[in-house]
């Protein structure tokens, strides 16, 4: 079959783009990739059609060549097509380079055994360096664009295999001084420098002269697949964000370069920074992030290299660069920014946020930067929200919120105002223009707009968003809280239809505000006349706030309202309030009301519910009523106890405490998976047990809450039923589990019983590291061993052997965790301790009665546990 024409390809590509999966599943789908590669070499197709084909291959490379062999063949064909292009200028050269790179990356074919990879890498390096271009790669005017494209392709390969181009650092460093595109070369050099520093710091090696240019014309390879394989993807953030101090300590190694390497490194970074002004703002931000991240992990290297750039960047109008400055400040603090720099930057942000012509997104950016401003010396604890110390009254006066602002901008400014009020500890009552006065004025204005009858729902939503923000920031500010509660009460009085908003607010606010707000709303709801049009909203509010309240006024309101409840919706709302009162025990007044409702309500469903509630109130105590009508997460099975009236109604609702009908024990443990699993065995003793639910509670706060385990049925005489309980330790320590069983009997009764507590031993938390490739065990263990210090601790313990030898002890207790064994003399053992610790053991040559054990761990708190465990092995 010959090559397709332009119209045929246009129809084929249109059908593919309409539904790629459906097209590939059809008859023409199998040949699409092969035909595309073949027709790229056809002279009958125009260059514009070939551009369309290559564009499709860039967008859908993973669908056209989904596996490594297909991607390898496609990349080889694309490179052959590139070589066969005529010498005249062509738009295909850049697209062919991009398509070959994309095919290798998306098909996961990039590697040392890939022939296309070994062809593409030297070609891209030659193009990026400006040499080996030759006449076959276009005219000199085209080669500048090819050089930029080659740098982009190399950058993509480096991102997929970090450390791959570490050997080309010296060559790449020499490129910015030559004639050629500055931006792609600078970004590529910064990326390779960043990745090389991280990879070398992981391995503990220095830069080893990598920054010095070498001559690769002799055929030596400047790329290193070994470094790329050693990269650990979780160490590299996926976006330009700075880690917290804790994240840095856990995941970012520190490199201490030699004096020669430090000198070359400073020169390379200074070279990139000196030409950074020639880059676009987005490219400059990426460059600063890469260099800042890399230098942050260098011991003894102060960030003074960035100082000359601050003169230019502190006055920039580009938001991306301003964000980069704040990122540098968050990373280096007072090591790079003086107090004058900090004051200037904060004033710059404050004045920028006051510009009247700013669009809302830009306005929000400035406000967010002020709210999250990284101070040199913050006074409060880490993670606590606070206004910047240098943000004085004069600076923030222009940042006060106004009702004329966009809602998102108003909330952001209100957030800042709340932080200023939190810092204003004096709270002078005669202060008429202070932060608290501004806050009360804004809240009053928002409440007045929300109270307009028939006003837009958006105004009410904004008012409640602002109220929640104030309660969240000023929990302990009694004056503001009192003002807010009084204003919300007036708002409900004016517009009861906002009851759903009030219910949602009560669910979200802190307990300090919830209780006084609940009392005020209860008073407002019961004070309204029962025949008003807002009756349904008052009933909805009472269903939320009536529980635990004084019932006399509430019952009086309900008795008056019952006469006006004429439809099914009002009946249900009225019964929901009765249900809320039932949960706190009810009383004679409630019983009389329920009897009246059971006789007077017009629909049968309402009468049945009222009769049911009356029976519950008559037969159950207050505590049982609370369990029966208010099922919680702690007792989910009790909701099923509600059933129709019958002779055994009262008995069926009672959960009886009995002796344990089952036997629960700890079985043999299996060390595998991401989290420890406690293997349990359960057996029924004398009678069948149905719908069994086992609930576990951990003493203390050592573990995350444990999920309940459900078993449909257990019968006596059956083999032990295995259960697997997933443990999520907050620290690697043994624990004691209290167990309760909730179950149903053959007679249909619900019972509960307490079981003997279970012990989680220290060894039950042990987890192995993933299986390693053969031959890499010793290097892996040495890397873990070296990474424990200086943050961790090292110790030596004597492990008695008893009657068994060293090999038997290791085989019985430590076999899953052995990284490398050289019996009978040496065992290297690596154990993961959740959530994020490890324990490393070196068992040396056994003596007559024991074996010396050298151990390291990154968690000093486990040392006593390790000693007790090793000394107790011989006694098992």
From Swiss-Prot:
Name of protein: AP-5 complex subunit beta-1
Gene Ontology CC terms: AP-5 adaptor complex; AP-type membrane coat adaptor complex; late endosome
One of the GO biological process terms: endosomal transport
InterPro entries cross-referenced by the UniProt entry: AP5B1 (IPR038741), AP5B1_barrel (IPR048980), AP5B1_C (IPR048981), AP5B1_middle (IPR048979), AP5B1_N (IPR048978)
Taxonomic classification: Eukaryota, Metazoa, Chordata, Craniata, Vertebrata
Top-level lineage group: Eukaryota
Membrane-spanning residues: none
Self-association state and partner proteins as the record states: Probably part of the adaptor protein complex 5 (AP-5), a tetramer composed of AP5B1, AP5M1, AP5S1 and AP5Z1. Interacts with ZFYVE26 and SPG11.
Stated role: As part of AP-5, a probable fifth adaptor protein complex it may be involved in endosomal transport.
Keywords: Protein transport, Transport
